[in-house]
Amino acid sequence: MSKSEKPKISIVNPVWQTIRSEAETVISSQREMTSVIYSSILIHENLESVLSYRLAQKLNTTDMSEAVLNEIILDAYKTEKRLVEDAYLDIVAVKERDPACHRFLQPLLYYKGFLALQAYRVGNFLNGNGRYDFSYFLQMRSSEVFGVDIHPNATIGKGIMIDHAHSIVIGETAVVGNNVSMLHSVTLGGTGKDKGDRHPKIGDGVLLGAGASVLGNIRIGRCSKVASGSVVLSNVPKFKTVAGVPAKVVGDSGCDQPASVMDQNIQ
């Protein structure tokens, strides 16, 4: 190496390093998990390889093989690095907010909400590049396999947690900001068959409780909280809590970051 050349430095995401370390710990203590851990994590060089494998493994059909799916998804990750960055942020969000998540590898191996979100992210990227039917295929399979139906045209930010993830519906023109948390059975839907911009806009840091429905082209202000089982039909100011059917403001959100604190009590 000449004096003018700088040594190459390999930068490895610390979360990825931790995931690999956690995986090795699992094998050392639970040898019956060896095959699962090796094929799902340790055999892979990076997170994008893991995600491509896991999504292809879950979403393949007799007409769309695992190998073909893996190749297409991995190519999307290699083309758009933002997809990998967003996946890391989603993993961290789950680890920080879900008290049942003790390790970074858990979302990758066991959490269908996380996997469904990554399937959406890949589909959204491909949809934006004209591969509409493949993005619809991913949407269909994600709905069938994970019970999560996110239209590939929806816009979803970074650091998202979808907890439990049964019966999640996010419509075509919905917008979800950064650092949002939602529990199972959340619907971000329209109010009929109107076309155009017809779905909710969810601000940064919002917490959507279990069974909450937000309907129509309305705005939920940043760092607000929608109580479980509520039906929201009108705009919600920032830093407020709404509850009821139809939902009404019942107080402040109680903290600066409801989605991070995950306190579902009504203040």
Protein language model annotation of sequence segments:
Residues M1-R141, A259-Q267:
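Terminal amphipathic alpha-helical/low-complexity segments used for targeting or macromolecular assembly
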Residues S143-V250, C255:
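Structural signal for interior beta-strand "rungs" in well-ordered beta-sheet cores
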